[in-house]
Amino acid sequence: MQKTAIIVPCYNESYRLKAEAFINYAKNNKMVYFFFVNDGSIDDTLEVINSLCRSYPEQMHCIDLKQNCGKAEAVRQGFLKAFEFDFNNIGYWDADLATPLEAINTLCSLLDRKQIKIAIGSRVKLLGYRIERAPLRHYLGRLFATCSSYMLRLHVYDTQCGAKIFKNNSDLQNVFSHPFNVRWIFDVEILVRYKMIIQDKGLGSLENYALEQPLEKWTHIQGSKVKIRDFFLAALELIKIYRM
């Protein structure tokens, strides 16, 4: 595996942040580094992150945002910090580990292919795969993904899974160079920005450079900050991206 940075945005995650899981993974994967971004948490998240980083400083780093900026900006700040180092790949991962850390290896293996620049985890319920989602969330998610694919001409099955890794290059740095226009569906805006860069260069379709990987395991974790009403806010943001 090439040298990889994983951004982990954290807002009030003190009870859900699985320190032992991160440490065990880091011990067995010396080429993976974690950047935990404390997004102005008002609980003990910062203390948990600092304790985690002290216990394994070689591969774990803390970025402390004094004010809550939202997940989109927290992820972006993490990428900007990672750009200061010589990482081959940079991605982001949900702090609750709904997607197991072992999937990092799977996504990174996709980036070993010459032309692939984007590796996306996808929650596809296949035979023998353990994808545990609440039915209502699943159907709302499928509706949103279908609308996104149709409106933005992005043939992506699952835009919102919080497990994505990218090759570190000038295009990626351009994508993250300025704040996102949306708060909830920045995952979609990332792909749209990348698509526009590729098109401006005359390099064809984003589909030539991105791969979705069905995850073997994904588990809905209690305490999610995403509410049903947020799907309606996401629809409004989708229109905003469409007008970019």
List PLM regions with ranges.
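Hydrophobic helical membrane-anchoring modules
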Residues: 1-2, 177-244
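Short beta-strand/loop segment that forms part of the nucleotide-sugar
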Residues: 8, 22, 31-41, 63-65
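Short, well-formed alpha-helical segments that are part of the catalytic scaffolds
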Residues: 12-27
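Acidic helix N-cap motif at the loop->helix transition within catalytic regions
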Residues: 15-19, 43-52
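Alpha-helix termini
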Residues: 25-29, 52-57, 81-88, 195-207
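A conserved acidic beta->alpha catalytic loop
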Residues: 38-47, 97
